[in-house]
Amino acid sequence: LVGSEMCIRDRVHWEHFYVGIFRCNQVLANVPAIEMDEVQKNQLLAQASFLRALWYFQINLLWEKGTLVLEPQNADYIPKDASEQEIWDQIEKDLTFAMENLPEAWDAADLGRATKGAAKALLGKAYMQQHKYDRAKEQLQWLIDREGSLYGLLDNREDNFTDLNENNQEGIFEIQFDDQNKGGTGNDASMAFGFQRTQFYAPGGTHGTGWGDGKARRWLVDEFLKERRVDGRNDLRLYNSILYKHFGDDFPDQSKKYYANEDASQWFDEWGQDTEDCYIRKYNTSYYREREDYFARNNYRIMRYADVLLSYAECLVETGTSASDAAVYVDKVRERAGLSKLKDSRWKDCLSSKEVFIKRLQMERALELCFEGWRWADLKRWGLLDSQAGIDELKPRDKDFN
């Protein structure tokens, strides 16, 4: 992996995944020999197994193969290639051990560590990527059954994207961040313990003090605007997720302030940007400061309960449950956003068949989970990347597929 800038970035990701795997392997190889409480020992081993599975999950998503390294090795060790299925098999083993030995919850001093629910949610996702929907449903059902005790949707969805209510009942697994620059060197996120994504997503120049990388697509804005809430207003998930030209017109009762800009809508015209220029607003830190930097304190939510609900609905309909019954779990997410149930919406015809329901569910996932890191997995699972019909479906929305 050498040559272009993209290849260099790929190499950095590859290297860092395997650095994480190496550290997990050190724990798994050495902790068993330590004399300590057996429950605590197994919890440590389970945490390492969970994280190793998480890194291998990403490797499978990005490269569909890798090298399966399960023990610490010398620097001159050259691993053999492993197939995608061999890696999935190891992920299943690691997560099965993790869920059997992790607690359902940690006390306040250990919040943020992997839990039984996190292992089950990730295992459910691993099964879904392999189209093992029966097995995935079983894992996700465990979390669904604990709604109201361990898990649930927050009343205010946006609390999932700030530092004001972290490790809450909707957060299944979160990467813990603070805003302190702890030093260090490197060309990547290893130089700080802060959340850096917003620095790269924020608009460039004095308007957003960021780099404008990873822009949103206009089709997503348009899709949000197709349906209003039951109170007649536009979907606030759009306001909190995407910054776009004339966004203030669509949300007249919301603030136009964005970082140091009292009216952020004006600089779209100042810079000659058109309606296709859209920026990712989710996770931004303008609620407490006027400029972005590399040290945001927001936790990054790897998995949250809204994702579990939508995934469970997909598993249900893929295993023979009616679209109407599966819609119950989609409606929980929609109603939290202020929308009507599917049966009362403009999309009510989606309940007529599995195929039509799946297409609507695909859009519901895009709206609720945009920019949270699961879109690539979704597209792969739905077969939209490996068939001409799938590519043709994506082309009108995203020019990168043309």
Q: Could you say what each language-model-derived stretch is?
A:
Residues 96-99, 113-264, 389-391:
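An aromatic- and glycine-enriched ligand-binding surface/loop that stacks and positions planar moieties
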Residues 14-20, 90, 157-218, 295, ...:
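Long, intrinsically disordered, low-complexity segments
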Residues 59, 130, 317-319:
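Structural motif corresponding to the intra-repeat A-B loop/turn of tetratricopeptide repeats
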Residues 4-63, 78-86, 95-108, 286-300, ...:
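Conserved, well-structured interaction surfaces
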Residues 236-335:
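C-terminal substrate/ligand-recognition segments
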